[in-house]
Amino acid sequence: LYVHFASRLSHCAVGSIHDAADARPLLVAVVPGAFYREHPEVGADGRELIELSAQQAWDCERIPTESLGTPLTNAKIINSYLSSALQRHRVILVSLSKGTTDAGVAQALRPDLFQKLAAWVSVSGVGCGTLMADWLLDKWYLRPILGLMLWRHGADRQAVSSMRYNSAQTFKAATDETQSPIVHIAGFPLQKHLSCRRARLWHRRFRTHGPNDSVVLLQDLLKFPGTVIPVWGADHYLRAGRNAAERVTQLIAMLDGNSEQNPDIHANSDPSLRTWSQFTARV
């Protein structure tokens, strides 16, 4: 599966989204993943991307979704944010993990907003739900633990049930209609690449269903429109070599292609990373 995606990039050039006629500044808007407030250490809060964007003189903001909100609740927050931001900025939306589910529902509600995006970058996006949710909901002996966890974080059961596998099909249907470039960055790990015991456990549970990153089934990427950049040996949080924030920063610099606005962007970028195939080979 990795070879399939990597080979598709071999002759694809990286197109620029920069429009000289559009004077609006660039804004990187981050849709965070689940538990981003409770467990910021996993990277789902986008903090590192915000810090790196500041170094590149880009505006970068985290959309204040609910850490354990349902996709519908968070979709409304995303659309409210975009309605305002798009009036003043060219927006690149970066969705992290479950943030992709939230953004997919947001697009289904307001496709007109997403057609105005400069680009959409999904990092380890959960686009079709996750078998994690099925496991937690269907195992009777886990129900008390799940209930306690939800109570502790002030969330309801719908926050988990809405993430059942195949429950987020809106993502595929909606993104088929977008005119904005969509890029999916996804880790392709083997068991030996996973340093976290919990990640190895989930990886083993899901492997009978096919290749996975310990959260999502990687064959689901075949359903999504846009460009898939596979990262060999990286887990769901893209921990391998350069981290997710560095990869996304490099990608945004290539997509924007506006060296006149900020020469340091390309001065700090490896010039060999100007095609999709070279990007995936190096990360």
Residue ranges and their predicted role:
Residues D19-V91, L146-L150:
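Active-site catalytic motif of lipid deacylating hydrolases and related acyltransferases
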Residues V31-A34, L96-S97, G125, G187:
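Glycine-rich His-Gly loop
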Residues L1-H4:
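Helix-enriched interaction subdomains in cytosolic or periplasmic regions
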Residues E177-V283:
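C-terminal catalytic-base region of ester-bond hydrolases, centering on the histidine
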Residues K76-T175:
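Serine-dependent carboxylesterase/thioesterase catalytic core
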Residues A29, E61, A119-V121, V183-A186, ...:
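Hydrophobic/aromatic beta-strand patches that form the interior of the parallel beta-sheet core
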Residues V42, T130-L136, H193-A199:
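Short aromatic-enriched loop/helix-cap "lid" or pocket-rim segments at secondary-structure transitions
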Residues A6-D19:
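A short, compositionally biased domain-edge/stem linker segment
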